[in-house]
Regions:
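A generic structural signal for well-ordered alpha-helical segments enriched in polar/charged residues
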Residues: 12, 16, 124-131, 193, ...
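Short amphipathic alpha-helices in soluble, non-transmembrane regions
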Residues: 6-15, 120-125, 222-223
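His/Glu-based metal-binding/catalytic segments typifying zinc-dependent metallopeptidases
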Residues: 1-87, 229
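In a subset of proteins, long, contiguous C-terminal domains/tails are tracked
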Residues: 185-229
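M16 family metallopeptidases and their MPP-like homologs
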Residues: 1, 50-72, 78-188, 203-211
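Generic recognition of flexible, low-complexity loop/linker segments
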Residues: 41-44, 82-83, 93-96, 192-198
């Protein structure tokens, strides 16, 4: 109802927006929007027997971390450490992480019988990276797996989606090429440098778990709020 009440005034304002913006910057006529982000840990309870367990956060200090190496570290975690700890040992149907060039990242599992053990595995991912010391052959296999994901043939829709993402993000082609070169030249030392980023995300990020009510209540101290879906 509030939206319906304000809609006429908004549409009227929209009609004059382009005229007011002519000859100047859009920032001169736009009201600045600042979103205040507050970390919150939520447990969302359902009748399900399993959980979807996620942590999302940001590393504010990315100094010393090569952006292209993030793809290699992600591949290493997804198909190595997390696969073994959360899928094989923990029994989850799936698990993954994402490490993004701006310092943001997340860990997530689905159809996961675990909760606290999964969160602990996320937090220990940094230790795994920090102690990474694989033989050159193993590292080469990881690099090949990473670069093959980047070079997978894409249908027109996927090419368009990628191009749109690059355009909206204003990422120059030179930066993408530099990151690709960093993937190919990745070393064990480069991988170990990503540990601080993984630690920041897992230790200071927000937790969100959707799943079994009893399991969530057993771990209620992890959450700021509990909701019933």
């Amino acid at each position: 109802k509030e939206i319906e009440k304000e809609l006429p005034a908004f549409l009227k304002r929209l009609d004059t927006f382009e005229q007011e913006a002519e000859g100047g910057s859009l920032n001169d006529v736009m009201t600045p929007f600042v979103m205040e982000l507050k970390p919150v840990n939520e447990g969302i309870m359902t009748p399900a027997e399993v959980q979807y367990v996620a942590i999302a956060g940001q590393c504010k200090d990315m100094s010393g971390i090569k952006r292209g190496v993030l793809d290699v570290a992600r591949h290493l975690l997804n198909f190595g450490y997390l696969w073994n700890e959360v899928r094989v040992k923990g029994g989850a149907y799936g698990v993954s992480c994402q490490l993004i060039r701006n310092g943001e990242g997340f860990f997530t599992s689905y159809r996961d019988p675990g909760l606290g053990s999964t969160l602990e595995a996320y937090r220990k991912a940094a230790d795994y990276l920090r102690s990474f010391d694989a033989e050159e052959r193993e590292l080469l296999k990881t690099i090949i797996g990473t670069i093959s994901g980047l070079d997978t043939p894409k249908p027109p829709a996927a090419k368009g989606k990628r191009s749109m993402g690059v355009y909206l993000s204003e990422i120059p082609e030179e930066v993408l090429q530099e990151e690709r070169d960093q993937v190919l030249a990745c070393s064990g030392e480069d991988i170990r440098a990503v540990a601080d980023m993984a630690e920041a995300i897992a230790s200071t990020g927000s937790i969100c778990v959707i799943g079994n009510e009893n399991h969530i209540r057993e771990e209620k101290d992890l959450f700021d709020k509990l909701l019933t879906l």
